[in-house]
Swiss-Prot record:
One of its GO terms (biological process) is L-histidine biosynthetic process. SUPFAM superfamilies: all-alpha NTP pyrophosphatases. Its main location: cytoplasm. This is Phosphoribosyl-ATP pyrophosphatase. The gene is hisE. InterPro entries: HisE (IPR008179), PRib-ATP_PPHydrolase-like (IPR021130). Its EC number is 3.6.1.31. The keyword Lipid biosynthesis does not apply. GO terms for cellular component: cytoplasm. Keywords: Amino-acid biosynthesis, ATP-binding, Cytoplasm, Histidine biosynthesis, Hydrolase, Nucleotide-binding. CDD domains: NTP-PPase_HisE. Belongs to the PRA-PH family. The keyword Nucleotide-binding applies. It comes from Mycobacterium leprae (strain TN).
Length: 93
């Protein structure tokens, strides 16, 4: 993988989001999304999955990568909301 100056790993993102869920900063969009519930998170994941699909068919790789990163973000927020760890998912890979 080609490294850039601002690389955040899947594990880094999960740790950051978990910390936000734990500390609940008042200005956090992640906290607001967690408070919105599973149904709203599920809708957001479906929306992002559709955007990934469309980007894969019609957009350059940079746009596709951004859409995939957003899908991963929302998937991790849903995982945290349901109490899943990365290891819970890794065991299924």
């Amino acid at each position: 993988m080609k490294q850039s100056l601002a690389v955040k790993t899947f594990e880094d993102l999960f740790a950051e989001l978990s910390e936000r869920a734990r500390t609940r900063p008042t200005d956090s969009a992640t906290v607001a999304s967690l408070d919105g519930g599973i149904h709203a998170l599920g809708k957001k994941i479906l929306e992002e999955a559709g955007e990934v699909w469309l980007a894969a068919e019609h957009e350059p790789k940079e746009v596709l990568a951004e859409e995939i990163s957003q899908l991963l973000y929302w998937t991790q927020v849903l995982m945290i909301s349901r109490g899943l760890s990365l290891d819970d998912v890794y065991r299924k890979l």
